[in-house]
């Protein structure tokens, strides 16, 4: 029986732009990437990254894979949105300020009963959500 999500990988159109977005917002530590200057004979070990990066986001991993030329659409089969957990409402307030500071449009904080959500999109239009419980 499964006990949690190990990792999620998002396909993106531009790895540099996506890295700047996710690292600028979340400052997650990089868990796995091919080191700069890796000799060609050793690069095959990193083939599973497909030129991307994997971040440690707490108890799970989130990867970015630069292969897509399509745009995200939650109305097609596949991913609807990615929701990331925060500890409480104060972190959500800080997130609003950070999104505003970086000029990232968002839907404002919404009360959904058991907590609050903040919805926004990444540069590839992937729907993202931050969730904060009412009681930390």
Describe each model-derived feature in a short phrase.
Residues 12-22, 81, 107, 117, ...:
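Secondary-structure boundary/capping motif
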Residues 36, 67-68, 133:
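Residue-level structural signal for beta-strand termini and adjacent loop
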Residues 5-14, 53-56, 71-136:
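Vicinal oxygen chelate
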Residues 21-24, 95-99:
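Short amphipathic alpha-helices in soluble, non-transmembrane regions
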Residues 63-66, 128-129:
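Conserved beta-strand in the GNAT
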Residues 11-60:
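Core segments of cupin and vicinal oxygen chelate
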